UniProtKB/Swiss-Prot annotation:
EC number: 3.1.-.-
EC class (word): hydrolase
Keyword annotations of the record: Endonuclease, Hydrolase, Nuclease, RNA-binding, rRNA-binding
Protein name as catalogued: Ribosome rescue factor SmrB
GO function term, MF aspect, one: RNA endonuclease activity
Gene that specifies this protein: smrB
Quaternary data: Associates with collided ribosomes, but not with correctly translating polysomes.
Record-annotated Smr domain positions: 98-173
Recorded family membership: Belongs to the SmrB family.
Organism: Pectobacterium carotovorum subsp. carotovorum (strain PC1)
Length: 180
């Protein structure tokens, strides 16, 4: 890139004579150490811990009792069955989507935990989990895992526009579950 204000020889000589006898300044800028840890580190650690905590509830040993007839559905005891009906009709539209295609069971558990933690953190009431068809491993396991989590109020097979029988709509409790 060319300098648009280039100096001719006379101007350059004038500049050099005007600065003769001057000394170059020593760098006097001081860089202070940060008082606190970097802000970006703490939320990443907190998010990872939330994900681990949320996936703690998912067990392959425990088999909750789910209805085998009809579409995949579940409502937590004490929660309103009307919420399940609204899920089925498509009254709720999910704000967060999770695609489990191509994940292993362990990865799927971690992602489900992260989704539920994100729902709580972002105050999202409805989310969509797309487990797909595949070999039916995640299709069978996903409802079992979701039924074990205390933050899940209900879930139902998603309407066609959100994935049909290859996805679930999940209602998440935003406040802490009551221990009655």
């Amino acid at each position: 890139m060319s300098n648009k204000y280039s100096l001719n020889d006379d101007e350059l000589q004038l500049f050099r004579t005007s600065i003769t006898g001057t000394k170059k300044l020593r760098q006097d800028t001081y860089t202070h150490k940060p008082l606190r840890r970097k802000i970006g580190e703490l939320p990443a650690k907190r998010a990872l811990q939330e994900q681990v905590d949320a996936s703690f509830y998912f067990s392959d040993e425990f088999q909750p009792q789910l209805d085998a007839e009809g579409p995949t559905r579940y409502v937590r005891p004490g929660a309103s069955h009307y919420e399940l009906k609204k899920l089925r009709r498509g009254d709720y539209s999910p704000e967060l989507f999770l695609d489990l295609h191509g994940l292993t069971q362990l990865q799927a558990k971690q992602e489900l935990g992260a989704l539920l933690a994100a729902c709580r953190r972002e105050h999202v009431y409805c989310a969509c989990v797309m487990h797909g068809h595949g070999k039916h491993i995640l299709k069978q396991q996903t409802p079992l895992w979701l039924a074990q989590h205390p933050d899940v109020l209900a879930f139902h097979q998603a309407p066609k526009e959100f994935g049909g029988n290859a996805a679930l709509l999940v209602l998440v409790a935003l406040e802490a579950p009551s221990l009655e």
